[in-house]
Amino acid sequence: MHSFNKDIGSLGEDIAKNYLNQIGYTVLERNFRCKVGEIDIIGKDGDYICFIEVKSRYGKLYGNPCESVNYPKRLKIYKAANIYMLRKKLFKFNFRFDVIEIIFNTYNDVPSIKLIKDAFQI
């Protein structure tokens, strides 16, 4: 990944974390990594443990950011989520997979933020 893309991704994750805190999520962990993949943000929303993929883009030239969360990516997130839940012994919790789209624009410094709850299931 190019440095510019990493910077956009990191900025998007910072914005997403702040947004989630504002709407009542509790952020439990960021950038959870294991042998099968990575989860950008793990949070708690009510009774749910949420595994959140953050997708950041400048504009929609290549479609909506959430469209890049394809089946292979979903499967990696799912496998990483299972490992996280086993390690933390979170068997009794409900869980779901959310996606946050962050779209930066050239007109102002205010990005568009869209949270898609229960964005996919495996």
Swiss-Prot record:
Pfam families: UPF0102 (PF02021). Transmembrane segments: none annotated. One of its GO terms (molecular function) is nucleic acid binding. InterPro entries: Restrct_endonuc-II-like, tRNA_endonuc-like_dom_sf, UPF0102_YraN-like. CDD domains: PoNe_Nuclease (cd20736). Belongs to the UPF0102 family. HAMAP family: UPF0102. PANTHER family: UPF0102 PROTEIN YRAN (PTHR34039:SF1). NCBIfam families: PRK12497.1-3, YraN family protein. This is UPF0102 protein CKL_1410.
